Amino acid sequence: MEDASLKSFLEKVGYRVVDRTLSREYEVARLIAETQGCGPPLLARIEGVRQPVAVNVVDTREKLYKALGVTGDSEAYAKIVDSTMRPGRLEYVDKPPLDEMPEGFEGLPAARFYEGEAGLYLSSGIVIACYEGVCNASIHRLLILGRERAAIRIVPRHLWHLYRKARERGEDLPATVVVGLHPAVLLAAATSPPLGVFELGLAAGMLGGSMKVYRSPVHGNPVPLGAAMVADVWITGEQVEEGPYVDALLTYDRVRRQPVVRLEAAYIKEGEYTHTIMGGSLEHVNLMGFPREASIWEAVRRALPRVRAVRLTPASGGWLHAVIAVEKQHEGDGKTAIMAAFAAHPSLKHVVVVDSDVDVDDPMQVEWAIATRFQADKDLVIIPRARGSTLDPSAADGLTAKMGLDATKPLDAGMGYERGRIPGFKWGSRRCHQPGD
């Protein structure tokens, strides 16, 4: 691929321009909340940000398909899994012309999205870091503290590993924050491949097998060509209180002591579009959950070859609850799918397995399957005090009770398990059809 520009992607799929400048204080949030899931991506001006800012770039599954160049879930999952196993090639090129951004962190498209949040948050930045030969790219929220200071939320995964390695040697971790990229790069940065598998290689695989990158001006970290904003930073040993922040579940994540990021230099690439994401928005949920759906799909498929659909539900932040549709071959397949899903995505809390005649995107059909095909004394799986998600406020100690519901019908099920059929009508379709429509 020539570059990983967000602008080139938006020009390909189409977008709509918002004809006013938005305040960082809640106006950006209202625009996202009012328009998400409806229509094309939007391009707006935000006060204090030099470049046009895109929102709702991949707030629907259809937009994710376009970002990956596929037409449906299975093809998308296969591309993500294949890119993880066989990453693409990074082609190093000369650094493009970049303009210094004297506003520093204050020039990033950060905003205050919810009442009670700690300040202006940026949730669309990819943090790229290389240390002792291991490179990582992942998405982390930044709380803007001033022109040269921000707080970063780091969970104990791969960036945390690199950060701890640096701190054990008394060093700050050199990193690069990149904003405004093709959504496939964001999707790759939201995956969790094994430590040492560089997420930019996954992005290259998703974008056709190769991706052009250049070295950041100060630290020399790889940056995808076409990035709108680039900031070389140090993740320091200093810590400050970070939060509250409204996360994927639309609840206020608790306040923690988190590292301070110190700015070394910030740059913009003229003519590009940058990007902001609201915590808990459909775009946030899609980017977080879709790679985990691919992991669940692959894990369950290895155990049961006929997996028809996987869905991490939007109401659970695309994170805690899964619905999986399968075609059973043997009794017990439902429980096998439950255990495979929990192993593939340790943050899962509840899993419902249904037959392939149930639409996983229709909560009424899923509840119907539970009502008609589930018995708690034989179809329920409970795993007490297992590792949970820090996003779940009811799992304060990091442990949770996991529950799986096998809502599949018996293999010898008779007509009593079938839903009534009306020729020419599909359950879940539009309810308010009028004669003549």
Swiss-Prot record:
<keyword id="KW-0464">Manganese</keyword>
<dbReference type="GO" id="GO:0046872">
    <property type="term" value="F:metal ion binding"/>
</dbReference>
<dbReference type="Pfam" id="PF20695">
    <property type="entry name" value="UbiD_N"/>
</dbReference>
<protein>
    <recommendedName>
        <fullName>Anhydromevalonate phosphate decarboxylase</fullName>
        <ecNumber>4.1.1.126</ecNumber>
    </recommendedName>
</protein>
<dbReference type="Pfam" id="PF01977">
    <property type="entry name" value="UbiD"/>
</dbReference>
<keyword id="KW-0456">Lyase</keyword>
<feature type="active site" description="Proton acceptor">
    <location>
        <position position="247"/>
    </location>
</feature>
<dbReference type="GO" id="GO:0016831">
    <property type="term" value="F:carboxy-lyase activity"/>
</dbReference>
<dbReference type="InterPro" id="IPR049381">
    <property type="entry name" value="UbiD-like_C"/>
</dbReference>
<comment type="function">
    <text>Catalyzes the conversion of trans-anhydromevalonate 5-phosphate (tAHMP) into isopentenyl phosphate. Involved in the archaeal mevalonate (MVA) pathway, which provides fundamental precursors for isoprenoid biosynthesis, such as isopentenyl diphosphate (IPP) and dimethylallyl diphosphate (DMAPP).</text>
</comment>
<feature type="binding site">
    <location>
        <position position="199"/>
    </location>
    <ligand>
        <name>Mn(2+)</name>
    </ligand>
</feature>
<comment type="similarity">
    <text>Belongs to the UbiD family.</text>
</comment>
<keyword id="KW-0285">Flavoprotein</keyword>
<keyword id="KW-0414">Isoprene biosynthesis</keyword>
<dbReference type="InterPro" id="IPR048304">
    <property type="entry name" value="UbiD_Rift_dom"/>
</dbReference>
<dbReference type="InterPro" id="IPR049383">
    <property type="entry name" value="UbiD-like_N"/>
</dbReference>
<keyword id="KW-0210">Decarboxylase</keyword>
<dbReference type="InterPro" id="IPR002830">
    <property type="entry name" value="UbiD"/>
</dbReference>
<keyword id="KW-0288">FMN</keyword>
<dbReference type="Pfam" id="PF20696">
    <property type="entry name" value="UbiD_C"/>
</dbReference>
<keyword id="KW-0479">Metal-binding</keyword>
<dbReference type="GO" id="GO:0005737">
    <property type="term" value="C:cytoplasm"/>
</dbReference>
<comment type="pathway">
    <text>Isoprenoid biosynthesis; isopentenyl diphosphate biosynthesis via mevalonate pathway.</text>
</comment>
<feature type="binding site">
    <location>
        <position position="136"/>
    </location>
    <ligand>
        <name>Mn(2+)</name>
    </ligand>
</feature>
<dbReference type="GO" id="GO:0008299">
    <property type="term" value="P:isoprenoid biosynthetic process"/>
</dbReference>
